[in-house]
Swiss-Prot record:
Protein name, as recorded: Phosphoenolpyruvate carboxykinase (ATP)
Amino-acid positions noted as binding substrate in the UniProt annotation, renumbered to this chain: 41, 175, 181, 302
Enzyme class label: lyase
Record GO biological process: gluconeogenesis
Metal-binding recorded as keyword: yes
Keyword Manganese in annotation: yes
Lineage of origin: Bacteria, Pseudomonadati, Pseudomonadota, Gammaproteobacteria, Oceanospirillales
Family: Belongs to the phosphoenolpyruvate carboxykinase (ATP) family.
Quaternary structure and partners: Monomer.
Subcellular location: Cytoplasm
Binding site for Mn(2+): 181, 200, 237
Length: 511
């Protein structure tokens, strides 16, 4: 006889998870789980059902891989049959904190801990679906084994989004990040139709009520820099920007745990307590203390906690439009300056480019080897529409509100990776502080010709030598050669975009 557990509290789900041996309790009160062979996202196993209502609007390719509609229905039924004879957990949650733009979702999971993850990362509304919208169904069944020949999948696991049916199927997937990113992809497709820009960014608000956004790929500092004790957190990863508002798509945070320390990241450290989930972190067998330096299971160790675990947060989970926008890049070549001031055209150029390094990548098969990458919109794996749709919406929003945009390099200085050193968190925090206070909007600047970037000549709390990257290299000719190589990469990557001459001219130039 199977049981259906509906809308259990976090404490009840923790009880269930431990009694079912899904995880162990750590000394800090968090639930520690192991996700098995998949310790990151599996991009080759992610699909979108190809059907008439959305087929023409999706940017099909290596990221948005098509899946047959009939095969989806058959697989969904098969998974439903499998779970119908087993215990399962159901929660009713929202995706999107805006009363107009939320999606109601029914989350069904095979494990208690995946249901707790859903409760931590999605929004637990006071009242479910007050606008009586059509419900989305998310089914996450990690012990179901897909058969590629029969099911049309790529492997034994799959994440499949079906817009026509309003369904998301996760089968054979234990890594919980797939669940949140699948619903982010759904909102990334739906929100632009409503004149809302979906963004892979973190967001916080100062005492002065000014909102600041941080765009960036995994490991560039989105979560760390937005978790600022002097400011109020909106969210750490996914937001929507509509007229008059920036709202969180989520109700929790999914932070990296590698080398986590109370000194450097107190907000995250303190959030890991009872009700939080810690993924793939090794704990001491006796006293159950987590060892955040141990990466024997994966470098992509994670913690998932609800926003209620953050003391200084925006209670409404949304705020006003951003006065400052930060594009975080981790430049492993040591060529880019620590901070640049961007025009709106340059902002569009760098938003489309999404240049960074894959640092502690969240994708399966990624090792600790660093490599440069261009990830459109600073989150290419999650955006189903063509990139231009998002870039145009960004420019529109910036023009209407007058937001200032900055490119901040959290990567290397004084030489490339292996020669130079990485910017320290305190230096980056000093730069962010100058951006948020408005200091950077009114400083003496210089122009770096070939990179086509405007940088400040001096900044309080930052050694002036660091501000022009060429000055930090002992071998200036080596810097020039490295810069030329990086500029070439920018130019080559940007050839694929069909944009105005003004945007193209705002990027680095070989001339």
């Amino acid at each position: 006889m199977s049981n259906i557990y509906t809308d259990l509290s976090s404490a009840e789900l923790v009880e269930q998870a431990i009694s079912r041996k899904e995880g162990r309790m750590a000394a800090n009160g968090s639930l520690v789980v192991n996700t098995g062979k998949r310790t990151g996202r599996s991009p080759m196993d992610r699909f979108i059902v190809q059907e008439p209502s959305t087929a023409d609007a999706i940017d099909w390719g290596a990221i948005n891989r098509p899946f047959d509609a009939e095969k989806f229905d058959a697989l969904w039924d098969r998974v439903e049959d499998y779970i119908s004879t087993r215990d399962r957990f159901v929660s009713h949650l929202h995706v999107g904190a805006d009363p107009e733009h939320y999606l109601p979702i029914k989350v069904t999971t095979e494990t208690a801990w995946h249901n707790l993850f859903g409760r931590n990362l999605f929004i637990r509304p006071e009242r479910y679906n007050p606008a009586d919208k059509q419900e989305w169904q998310v089914m996450n069944i990690p012990d179901f084994v897909c058969e590629p020949e029969r099911d049309g999948t790529n492997s034994d696991g799959a994440v499949i989004i079906n817009f026509a049916r309003r369904k998301v199927l996760l089968a054979g997937m234990r890594y919980a990040g797939e669940m949140k990113k699948a619903m982010f992809s759904v909102q990334n497709f739906l929100l632009p139709e409503k004149d809302v820009l979906p963004m892979h960014c973190s967001a916080n608000v100062g005492e002065d009520g000014q909102t600041c956004l941080f765009f960036g790929l995994s490991g560039t500092g989105k979560t760390t820099l937005s978790a600022d004790e002097s400011r109020f957190l909106i969210g750490d990863d996914e937001h929507g920007w509509g007229r008059g508002t920036v709202f969180n798509v989520e109700g929790g945070c999914y932070a990296k745990c590698i080398d986590l320390s109370q000194k450097n990241e107190p907000v995250i450290w303190n959030a890991i307590r009872f009700g939080a989930i810690v993924e793939n972190v090794v704990i001491d067998d006796q006293d159950r203390t987590p060892d955040y330096t141990d990466v024997s299971l994966t470098e992509n160790t994670r913690c998932a906690y609800p926003l209620e675990h953050v003391e200084k947060r925006v209670l409404e989970n949304r705020a006003g439009e951003p006065s400052a926008i930060v594009f975080l890049t981790c430049d492993m070549t040591g060529v880019l300056p620590p901070v640049s001031i961007l025009s709106k055209e340059a902002a569009a150029y760098h938003f489309l480019s999404g240049y960074t390094a894959l640092v502690g990548s969240t994708e399966m098969g990624s090792s600790s080897k660093l490599k440069s990458t261009f990830s459109t919109c600073f989150g290419a794996p999650f955006f189903p529409r063509p990139a231009g749709v998002y870039a145009e919406l960004l420019m529109k929003r910036m023009e209407e509100f007058g937001s200032k945009v900055y490119l901040v390099n959290t990567g290397w200085t004084g030489g490339p990776h292996g020669v130079g050193k990485r910017f320290s968190i305190p230096v980056t925090r000093a730069i962010i502080s100058a951006i948020q206070s408005g200091e950077l909007a009114d400083v003496e600047t210089e122009h770096l010709e070939k990179l086509n970037l405007t940088v400040p000549k001096e900044l309080e709390g930052v050694d002036s030598v660091l501000l022009n990257p060429r000055n930090t290299w002992a071998d200036k000719e080596a810097y020039d050669a490295k810069a030329q190589d990086l500029i070439q990469q920018f130019v080559e990557n940007f050839k694929k975009f069909d944009v105005s001459d003004a945007i193209r001219a705002a990027g680095p130039s070989l001339d």
